[in-house]
Design a protein with these regions (language model features):
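Membrane-proximal intracellular helices of multi-pass ion channels
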Residues: 1-480
């Protein structure tokens, strides 16, 4: 394994991050706030980290699979490390552990925060927080692949590693188109969202920040009360639509606009996903109305729809204190936080594709018990699922729930109540953000012991890297 090659590619990612830090510093300079020097110094340090390997290490004609995993996972981890720099230099609530937690939460698009007063941050730092969401939404490596043409033909190997296996199955295009498709949709959707939010009453700065977070399904807001600060049905419905679109498979979005056969409207996964959202919204809305949580059915359904879409897409924006909702509503929201959005999107979580496939596997096994000699084929969105794919999904979901269980046990060991411990573990591994109980939708993670913040950051990284990518990185020396 050639570590010099790995350093060159990771260095490319660092150059991208330094550019975003420089933009954030420019915002602080224009707004004349105290975030300028922390961001400028961070940009220079990150630039140096990225420039040296790019200058002194020659390009490689090819990279191995092992090197590819090291590049992708190493880029994510180092991005989280340099992402700490502006927070640490700024100080305030950002201790070493808090800065690490906030950085990991941003890049993994979890959106969980240790800040007790978000609005006290300078505008430049607020923009940097949202930028970490936006960069992490499509993948830190993907940005480097788009921006730096010097990475050459190895782009394809890296983009394949960055995507989950289910996502790759659903991209029915030439591999070299994947990066362009992803980022064209991503950037276009961000611009459209910004304009819509501005027209709806947000300031330009807030509109840009919320657009970046919404399209990344990240959830960082510039307000302590999140989207609830605006108390605007129009803003809420705009964000509901954008969060939903962002949680759909980007390949299917592209197919829909290019009028190909495999599009959103013909996708079995999207139909099931939409049905789950509508069903959950109606059930929770009815629960809120009949429990007199809200004064009328329309407000109940609006609040229900926003929180349902926010959690199932793993965005984590909030307009209500869900801790005050009925136990029935809370249970449904936790289930949605486990299922989450579609593969090939910016959403985290187990993915509705996997859950649906697992349901088909169970159905096939039951049929196999009734008809032992039958040959039962399992298809998902028209694609025949091989035994290897089925076994991978089963193993993934098993590992996913084991990690939630271990996270819950560990959190309970350090004094968290069961609801807070379980929901925070679900929120971390699923990159959802808010949980329930002590870490509810309008609360934060400031009071967590440092050890649990570190545990949470590890779970966030594992979730964002689809678990196995992180595990393979840890045991990469054992590969043959």
């Amino acid at each position: 394994m050639r570590f010099n090659v790995i350093l060159r590619y990771v260095g490319a990612v660092m150059l991208c991050l330094s550019a975003f830090m420089a933009v954030s510093a420019g915002i602080s300079l224009v707004s004349n706030d105290a975030g300028f020097y922390p961001l400028l110094l961070s940009a220079l340090l990150t630039l140096l980290l990225g420039a040296f390997p790019m200058i002194f290490v020659s390009k490689a004609d090819s990279i191995t699979t092992k090197e590819g995993f090291m590049i992708v996972v190493g880029s994510w981890v180092l991005s989280c490390v340099v992402g700490m720099f502006p927070y640490l230099i700024w100080g305030g609530e950002f201790t070493l552990v808090n800065a690490w937690f906030e950085s990991v939460s941003g890049f993994t698009t979890t959106g969980a925060s240790i800040l007790t007063d978000i609005e006290a941050l300078p505008q430049g730092l607020l923009f940097w927080r949202s930028a970490t969401n936006w960069i992490g939404g499509v993948g830190v490596v993907m940005f480097a692949l788009l921006i730096l043409p010097s990475l050459g033909t190895n782009k394809m190997a890296l983009s394949g590693i960055e995507l989950s296996s289910l996502a790759k199955d659903n991209y029915r295009y030439r591999t070299q188109m994947v990066v362009k498709i992803l980022l064209t949709i991503y950037i276009g959707l961000t611009i459209i969202t910004t304009l819509l939010l501005k027209v709806s009453g947000m300031r330009w700065f807030d509109a840009v920040n919320h657009a970046m977070s919404a399209c990344a399904t990240g959830g960082f807001s510039t307000k302590n009360a999140s989207v609830g600060f605006y108390d605007s049905p129009l803003i809420e419905w705009i964000l509901i639509v954008i969060m939903f679109i962002s949680s759909l498979h980007y390949g299917l979005i592209y197919s829909t606009f290019t009028r190909k056969a495999n599009n959103i409207f013909r996708s079995e996964v999207v139909r099931v996903y939409a049905a789950i959202i509508v069903g959950a919204t109606l059930l929770i809305g009815a629960s809120l109305y009949f429990s007199d949580t809200y004064e009328n059915i329309f407000t109940s359904l609006r609040q229900s729809a926003f929180q349902v879409v926010s959690l199932i897409t793993t965005t984590g924006f909030a307009t209500a204190n869900t801790n005050l909702w009925t136990p029935f509503a809370i249970v449904i929201l936790i289930i949605l936080s486990i299922i989450c959005g579609c593969a090939g999107s910016t959403s985290g979580g187990a993915k509705v594709d996997r859950v649906l496939l697992y349901g088909k596997v169970l159905k096939a096994r039951l049929r196999g018990q009734q008809h032992p000699n039958a040959i039962i084929r399992i298809r998902l969105d028209g694609i025949l699922q091989e035994d290897r794919q089925v076994n991978t999904v089963t193993l993934f979901l098993t590992t996913y729930f084991v990690l939630i269980l271990l996270g819950t046990l560990s959190s309970a060991l350090f004094g968290m109540d069961l609801l807070s411990a379980f929901s925070s573990s679900v929120a971390f591994i699923g990159n959802v953000g808010p949980g329930f109980g002590a870490v509810g939708s309008l609360d934060n993670y400031a009071e967590l012991p440092s050890i649990l913040k570190i545990q949470g950051s590890i779970l966030m990284l594992m979730g964002r890297l689809e678990i196995f990518g992180f595990i393979q990185f840890l045991f990469i020396r054992m590969w043959r």
